[in-house]
């Protein structure tokens, strides 16, 4: 069994660089002091994100392949949320010396598979030793002549729409924490057809947590269709919708009946998790309220699905992959005569299902 400490940095790079995608916009890839990417638009969209062992992933659940897929997903989704097309990533990887080389090569394969649908290249980065696994990625994107879609553009009358799955990652995490699903999974990609789970439904939820599969093409389609605001939902629907509401100075009201297909996909897992954790009777009777509440929490507050939330002008035909889930309203005066704060409601009512993910409180 070969470990990282058994090889030099150059020998490790010789194993992983050939596994990485070059990318259609790459003019100069790994091997020099810096990479060179084409920028036909004249502008770069740039974002960065970090994953830390035992904070964002756990090696008892996640293989190197899983972490590579997750790292690609959460970075590429940020570019898609601006209405841009991802073009290239630079990756910094910190690995303890006793890490198996197979973990590192698996990471490279996962990163490559995560980029495959976008044409983005893994064009360089850095490799270092350290006390725990850390991944930091900076990703670039191309607007292709369009304006970036900001969080601050939502206007009263706009339609709120969603692309991707809701609550699956949170349910997958719960299944792992309760021991109801064993890992590791195979390296097969997550397959989703019209919101319906394929193969083993619990395993698909766990795969959504370990290897998020964001609707990257939907971001470009939204930008082309004239979306007024958009973001990547990594921290929970209510928390992230609130970011659009505050940036735009509006009220967002979400449809209480939205995400029916996701609810159906989650209910079996919720019943099992409720039984395993003592939330309530998993059969008929009062326990069903606990199950519904758990599904609500996953839908409204569950993070790391990396779906997209956007607003579109009323009357706009929603692009492929998008579903209407709410409405944008003007912020009305508060009862005391002052100005009410931008907010998010569900069916016109405030709902407390937890705060969503916060890096310093969760």
Feature annotation, model-predicted:
Residues 45-48, 132, 149-221:
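Short, acidic (Asp/Glu-rich) active-site segment that either coordinates a divalent metal cofactor
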Residues 24-26, 34-35, 112, 123-128, ...:
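A generic local secondary-structure boundary/capping motif
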Residues 39, 87-179:
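Glycine-rich anion-binding loops of enzyme active sites
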Residues 64-89, 109-117, 217-220, 236-244:
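Small-aliphatic-rich amphipathic alpha-helix that forms the alpha element of a beta-alpha
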Residues 192-242, 292, 301-307:
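Polyanion-binding loop/helix "lid" in catalytic or ligand-binding cores
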Residues 1-63, 82, 91, 112:
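Extreme N-terminal cap/leader segments of soluble proteins
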Residues 36, 75, 83, 122, ...:
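Residue-level signal for inorganic ion chemistry
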Residues 1-21, 62, 96-121, 128-135, ...:
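Glycine-/charge-enriched secondary-structure boundary and capping motifs
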């Amino acid at each position: 069994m070969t470990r990282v400490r058994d090889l030099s940095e150059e020998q490790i790079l010789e194993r992983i660089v050939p596994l990485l995608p070059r990318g259609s916009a790459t003019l100069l890839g790994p091997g020099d002091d810096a990479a060179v990417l084409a920028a036909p638009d004249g502008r770069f969209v740039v974002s960065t994100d970090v994953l830390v062992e035992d904070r964002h992933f756990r090696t008892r659940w996640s293989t190197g392949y899983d972490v590579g897929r997750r790292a690609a997903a959460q970075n590429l989704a940020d570019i898609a949320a601006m209405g841009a097309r991802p073009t290239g990533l630079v990756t910094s990887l910190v690995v303890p010396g006793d890490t198996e080389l197979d973990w590192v090569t698996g990471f490279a394969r996962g990163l490559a598979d995560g980029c495959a649908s976008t044409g983005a290249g893994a064009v360089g980065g850095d490799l270092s030793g350290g006390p725990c696994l850390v991944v930091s990625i900076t990703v670039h994107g191309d607007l292709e002549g369009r304006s970036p879609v900001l969080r601050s553009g939502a206007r009263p009358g706009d339609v709120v729409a969603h692309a991707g799955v809701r609550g699956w990652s949170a349910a997958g995490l719960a299944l792992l924490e309760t021991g109801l699903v064993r890992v590791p999974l195979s390296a097969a990609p997550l397959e989703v057809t019209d919101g319906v789970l394929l193969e083993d439904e619990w395993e698909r939820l766990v795969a959504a947590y370990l290897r998020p599969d964001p609707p990257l093409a939907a971001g470009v389609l939204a930008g082309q269709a004239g979306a007024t605001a958009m973001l990547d939902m990594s921290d929970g629907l209510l928390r992230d919708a609130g970011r659009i509401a505050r940036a735009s100075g509006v009220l967002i009201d979400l449809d209480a009946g939205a995400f029916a297909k996701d609810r159906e996909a989650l209910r079996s897992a919720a019943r099992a998790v409720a039984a395993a954790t003592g939330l309530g009777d998993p059969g008929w009777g009062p326990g069903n309220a606990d199950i519904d509440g758990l599904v609500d929490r996953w839908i409204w507050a569950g993070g790391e699905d990396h779906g997209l939330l956007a607003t579109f002008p009323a009357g706009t035909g929603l692009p492929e992959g998008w579903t209407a889930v709410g409405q944008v309203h003007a912020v009305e005066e508060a009862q005391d005569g002052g100005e009410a704060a931008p907010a998010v409601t569900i069916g016109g009512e405030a709902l407390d299902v937890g705060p969503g993910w916060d890096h310093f409180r969760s």
